[in-house]
């Protein structure tokens, strides 16, 4: 989830610096990082340069990691995390290429695995703290497939058609699908310009309200199971949408619930900050530095500040989905 990833940053160089205060105490009792004839560089010197907000963010990330791991380690299966990482390695062409990509981002394989664990702990926290009823799940989700005919944003684009030709093609496909709804998947595989869904017979899986752009969502949620929409225009082109039969709803319910929780948190960050505050209180987290405490309360635990960060992130656009979650 992007919002939560924004708040819970990976342990970076500043975290290692904080760790130096304790882990290397036997090597340097006065916390000297570098010595020279011109003078020493101590942890305190660097921390002054870093600024309170950066120190607060990193300190909070470390303590939250410890607390979440203690509370939810028995609810997270590390084998599932290993399986996910194996899939990601395959997507990047193997373990060596995957680790090279991580290295370019300043992260080791072990750091990445820890971040994946933390993400799993976060999900457990929100499952505990954010209520989503079965009724909400039913009302706010729909299994969908689509066929997309892309419109070129500029004439030099390799993929897509002119607006006129794209619309004509979409209308022709829509009539064909309306006559033969059982062949939707076959037609999607052949005609759709959304390559990721085309190879799955056009399937988008379960779509959550608020997840897609407005015109797409409105058309989808008007459909009854098995129905096909008229041609729908979005900024990406022309779509033909189908409401699929929800034969796997029970097995997918937990995943749908997780998506709904993420959407709720995107819309109302206070749900997340309240969950953090309850957890910190439960674990008797005590801020020893008043400035650090204020920096954490004014940024990480302030839902309005999180909302601002969220809006800044969304300005870049995120494709067919609204939140990119």
UniProtKB/Swiss-Prot annotation:
It holds the Pfam family Rotamase. GO terms for biological process: protein folding. It catalyses: [protein]-peptidylproline (omega=180) = [protein]-peptidylproline (omega=0). It is found in: Cell membrane. This is Foldase protein PrsA. It is an enzyme of class 5 (isomerase). Residues 159-202, 303-325 are annotated as: Disordered. Residues 139-245 form the PpiC domain. One of its GO terms (cellular component) is plasma membrane. It comes from the Bacteria. The gene is prsA. The keyword Nucleus does not apply. Residues 1-20 form the signal peptide. The keyword Signal applies. InterPro entries: Foldase_PrsA (IPR023059), PPIase_dom_sf (IPR046357), PPIase_PpiC (IPR000297), PrsA_foldase (IPR050245), Trigger_fact/SurA_dom_sf (IPR027304). Belongs to the PrsA family. It is a lipid-anchor. Plays a major role in protein secretion by helping the post-translocational extracellular folding of several secreted proteins. It comes from Staphylococcus epidermidis (strain ATCC 12228 / FDA PCI 1200). A lipid is attached at residue 21 (S-diacylglycerol cysteine).
């Amino acid at each position: 989830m992007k919002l939560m990833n924004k708040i819970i940053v990976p342990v970076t160089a500043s975290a290692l610096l904080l760790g130096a205060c304790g882990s290397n105490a036997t090597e340097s009792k006065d916390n000297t990082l570098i010595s020279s004839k011109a003078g020493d560089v101590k942890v305190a010197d660097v921390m002054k340069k870093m600024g309170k907000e950066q120190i607060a963010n990193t300190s909070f990330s470390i303590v939250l990691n410890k607390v979440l791991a203690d509370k939810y380690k028995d609810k997270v299966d590390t084998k599932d995390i290993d399986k996910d990482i194996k899939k990601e390695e395959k997507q990047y062409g193997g373990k060596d290429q995957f680790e090279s990509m991580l290295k370019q981002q300043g992260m080791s394989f072990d750091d990445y695995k820890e971040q994946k664990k933390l993400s799993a702990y976060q999900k457990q926290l929100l499952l505990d703290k954010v209520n989503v009823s079965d009724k909400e799940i039913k009302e706010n989700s729909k299994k969908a497939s689509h066929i997309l005919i892309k419109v070129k944003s500029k004439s030099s684009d390799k993929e897509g058609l002119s607006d006129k030709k794209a619309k004509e093609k979409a209308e022709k496909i829509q009539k064909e699908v309306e006559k033969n709804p059982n062949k939707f998947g076959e037609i999607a595989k052949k005609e759709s310009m959304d390559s990721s869904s085309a190879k799955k017979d056009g399937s988008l899986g379960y779509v959550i309200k608020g997840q897609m752009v407005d015109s797409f969502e409105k058309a989808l949620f008007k459909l009854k199971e098995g129905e096909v929409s008229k041609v729908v225009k979005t900024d990406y082109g022309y779509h033909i949408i189908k409401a699929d039969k929800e034969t796997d709803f029970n097995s997918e319910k937990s995943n749908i619930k997780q998506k709904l929780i993420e959407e709720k948190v995107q819309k109302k960050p206070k749900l997340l900050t309240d969950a953090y505050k309850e957890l910190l209180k439960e674990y008797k987290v005590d801020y020893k530095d008043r400035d650090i405490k204020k920096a954490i309360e004014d940024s990480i635990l302030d839902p309005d500040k999180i909302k601002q960060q969220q809006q800044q992130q969304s300005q870049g656009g995120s494709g067919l989905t609204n939140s990119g979650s």
